[in-house]
Amino acid sequence: MVFTGLALEFTVVGFLFYSFPVIWPYLISELGMTESQLGMVSAFYFIPVAILAIIIGRALDKYSVKNFMMIGAIIYAVGLFSLSFINSYWSLLTIYLTILALGSIMMGNLAVAKLISNWFDKNAGRALGIAAIGISFSGVVLPLVVDPLLDLVGWRNV
């Protein structure tokens, strides 16, 4: 369970936040976006996430965490795939604020914390700490992986 949590934290935070700035130059040159607009995408993302956290948090107390995480992973994957079709700032913003926000809250920090706290009676804090390593680890690894792939396959395929 701890490794699953680590992998989910790595994926959700890594792709949305640590890989995104690496792609900025391509979005600026190809789609004419500004750095300010791209920065606001990440900032605005937290508005629906904050609202959804209350709703999803309550639902996680009633329903299966595993099912929420699986559905969230599918939604998140659809959101990442959808990014390859963006053609404007507004399409990027829409995907981040809807599909990615919903998918990430269903499989990210909130769900991971619930999953681990349900699994461990003792040492839950340690288990949560180990899972949280995925966040930092993704910040080191993903930019190093994504950057060379951009030149190799293009930003829409990364």
Regions found by a protein language model. Give the residues of each.
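Juxtamembrane helix-start elements in MFS-like secondary transporters
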Residues: M33-S42, L128
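Cytoplasmic helix-loop-helix junction between adjacent transmembrane helices
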Residues: Y96-I133
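Helix-loop-helix hairpin linking two adjacent transmembrane segments in secondary transporters
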Residues: K122, I130-V158
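Short hydrophobic/alpha-helical segments at membrane-entry points of transmembrane helices
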Residues: W90-Y96
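Short hydrophobic/small-residue motifs within alpha-helical transmembrane segments
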Residues: Y45-I47, S136-F137
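Conserved MFS/SLC helix-loop-helix module at the cytosolic interface between two early adjacent transmembrane helices
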Residues: I51-W90
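Extracytoplasmic
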Residues: M1-E35, A53-I56, L142-P143
